[in-house]
């Protein structure tokens, strides 16, 4: 689920109760207005949340600067638009008071409510996307990594967010670094995807090494651990005192975009020494950077997509081959650092265990069995990759599944594949994959015929794909008279449970006009009735009566559909008898 959809889960009002606020503190300095063609800066300044949400969903960088070197959050804070500020913060806008952009936002805040919002998000960063969250869980599942970061959280005097991580998140590392005698557990493919330095090392000098010991005393353990944590989570959290060490490590690891951002923040830190809060607060300060601040090609999904492309290119070489598992040699996978071979429909896919295990509980269990009992080796030589074989799905569907597992999205999809992928998402416990399929399918649905929309409505209801279900229900409700004229819509009614006639039995009770719609999946025809009442914008005192009229209309359509079905069966019987 995207951070935008999770916005309701952020409840900061309790944090504001202890503030003595005037009514004027809750009002923006300028009235809200719509800027349908505005950029992110204009939308933030105007308080146009709908336009801002659209821009964020299309991938606009929320930390981009305009020609006055200002970010969008600055304008939202300056104008007092708390909803716009909250939306930007939930999607990675920098708000730390110890950064250049965050400092400006704090000082420009129109009122205490805005400043309190910034403080709340500074103490508790927004939730990570599914890919980043899964890999972060894997990183913190390693006990040495978790112990160090828990110690850092205690030193930084922030709430404990790591206590829930334990053995259930553990997936064994394939490389261990020792810095000043202290270990960091990691996985080669993640480091290689994020850093050209690590990629070159793992392909050459460190190819067969499971432990790497750094002898340089100047190498900072906190800085290196924070950087590797960033490689997994796309979120950098580091003590301000360790930032200079991190710049040196970024230079060696060739993380140029991250290095430039940290260098700029260091300049700000040097010129911010006059700030009185440094004297008042003796606790260590931390710097937080979201991955969205980096160019898209340097973020985690793009980095893993490059690894995936190399792996898929090699899988095409083995297309529809009948050779034995013994042909999948380690040497074939050096470039992509693949460490498992998955065969689907006679095609070999070179994959990475840590990605599969982090994204799917099913693969975590399968790979754990392979590693513990050598299920995939079957007595083959030691230079062969572990081998898995998956059944009852096509190679095309598996390719789309691993594309999502590596990148958290799907660039495009054939509508004919959708049902199989929905089924695959359920079987492999990859439920967010359904949302990614829905996002890729929506452009196709814009040109779908009523008959096709009826099919999509039934399919989305069957697999619980709420986004497509809601989209189809909205279209049917707004064009109800056009749909009732189609044979496919009437035939669909025969396959669905009837609507709840008694209002006490309805899964979706008619709500007041303009009220927030429920997203819980209930009886499909009950929900269609609610959508229709909403589209008709009927007055509250007429809604129950109108709901009964709607139910009677559906009952008439069902009778027509049954008659049409009987006539069709009779004609088919005559044809077979002739």
UniProtKB/Swiss-Prot annotation:
Q: In which pathway does it act?
A: Protein modification; protein ubiquitination
Q: Where is the BTB domain?
A: 173-240, 338-414
Q: Where are the ANK repeats?
A: 35-64, 68-97
Give the keywords, sorted.
ANK repeat, Repeat, Ubl conjugation pathway
Q: Write one Pfam family the protein is assigned to.
A: Ank_4
Gene3D superfamilies linked to this entry: Ankyrin repeat-containing domain, Potassium Channel Kv1.1, Chain A
One Gene Ontology term from the biological process aspect of the record = innate immune response
InterPro entries reported in the protein's UniProt record? ABTB1, Ankyrin_rpt, Ankyrin_rpt-contain_sf, BTB/POZ_dom, SKP1/BTB/POZ_sf
Record note on domains: The BTB/POZ domain mediates the interaction with some component of ubiquitin ligase complexes.
What biological function has been recorded for the protein in this entry? May act as a substrate-specific adapter of an E3 ubiquitin-protein ligase complex (CUL3-RBX1-BTB) which mediates the ubiquitination and subsequent proteasomal degradation of target proteins.
**Protein name, please?**
BTB/POZ domain-containing protein At2g04740
């Amino acid at each position: 689920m995207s951070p935008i959809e999770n916005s309701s889960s952020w409840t900061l009002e309790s944090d504001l109760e202890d503030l003595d606020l005037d009514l004027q503190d809750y009002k923006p300095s300028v009235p809200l207005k719509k800027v349908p063609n505005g950029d992110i800066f204009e939308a933030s300044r105007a308080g146009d949340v709908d336009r801002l949400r659209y821009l964020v969903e299309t991938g606009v960088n929320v930390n981009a600067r305009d020609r006055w070197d200002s970010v969008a959050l600055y304008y939202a804070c300056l104008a007092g638009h708390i909803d716009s500020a909250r939306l930007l913060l939930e999607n990675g806008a920098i708000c730390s008071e110890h950064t250049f952009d965050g400092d400006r936002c704090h000082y420009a805040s129109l009122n205490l409510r805005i400043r309190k919002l910034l403080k709340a998000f500074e103490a508790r960063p927004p939730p990570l996307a599914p890919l980043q969250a899964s890999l972060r869980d894997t990183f913190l599942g390693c006990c040495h990594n978790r112990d160090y970061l828990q110690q850092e959280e205690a030193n930084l005097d922030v709430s404990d967010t790591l206590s829930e991580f334990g053995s259930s998140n553990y997936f064994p590392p394939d490389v261990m670094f020792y810095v000043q005698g202290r270990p960091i557990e990691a996985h080669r493919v993640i480091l290689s995807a994020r850093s050209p330095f690590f990629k070159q090392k793992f392909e050459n000098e460190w190819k067969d090494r499971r432990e790497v010991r750094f002898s340089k005393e100047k190498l900072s353990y906190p800085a290196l651990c924070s950087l590797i944590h960033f490689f997994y989570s796309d979120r950098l959290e580091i003590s301000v005192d360790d930032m200079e060490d991190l710049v040196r490590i970024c230079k060696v690891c060739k993380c140029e975009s991250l290095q430039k951002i940290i260098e700029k923040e260091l300049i700000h830190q040097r010129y911010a020494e006059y700030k009185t809060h440094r004297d008042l607060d003796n606790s260590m300060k931390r710097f937080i950077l979201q991955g969205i601040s980096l160019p898209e090609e340097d973020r985690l999904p793009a980095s893993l997509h490059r690894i995936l492309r190399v792996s898929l290119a090699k899988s095409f070489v083995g297309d529809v081959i009948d050779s034995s598992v013994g042909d999948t040699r380690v040497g074939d996978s050096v470039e992509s650092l693949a460490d498992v071979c998955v065969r689907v429909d006679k095609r070999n896919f070179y994959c990475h265990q840590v990605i599969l295990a982090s994204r799917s509980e099913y693969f975590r269990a399968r790979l754990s069995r392979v590693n513990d009992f050598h299920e995939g080796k079957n007595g083959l030589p030691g230079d062969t990759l572990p081998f898995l074989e998956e059944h009852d799905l096509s190679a095309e569907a598996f390719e789309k599944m691993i594309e999502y597992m590596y990148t958290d999205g799907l660039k495009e999809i054939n509508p004919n594949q959708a049902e199989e992928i929905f089924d695959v998402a359920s079987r492999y416990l990859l439920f967010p994959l359904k949302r990614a399929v829905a996002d890729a399918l929506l452009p196709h649905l814009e040109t779908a015929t009523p008959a096709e929309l009826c099919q999509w409505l039934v399919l989305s209801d069957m697999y619980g794909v709420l986004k497509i279900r809601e989209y189809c229900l909205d279209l049917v409700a707004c064009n109800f008279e056009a749909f009732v004229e189609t044979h496919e819509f009437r035939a669909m009614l025969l396959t669905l449970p009837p609507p709840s006639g008694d209002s006490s039995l309805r899964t979706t009770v008619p709500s007041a006009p303009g009220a927030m719609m429920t997203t819980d999946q209930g009886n499909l025809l009950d929900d269609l009735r609610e959508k229709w009442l909403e589209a008709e914008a009927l007055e509250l005192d007429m809604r129950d009566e109108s709901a009964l009229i709607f139910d009677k209309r559906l009952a008439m359509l069902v009778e027509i559909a049954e008659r049409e079905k009987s006539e069709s069966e009779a004609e088919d019987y005559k044809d077979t008898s002739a």
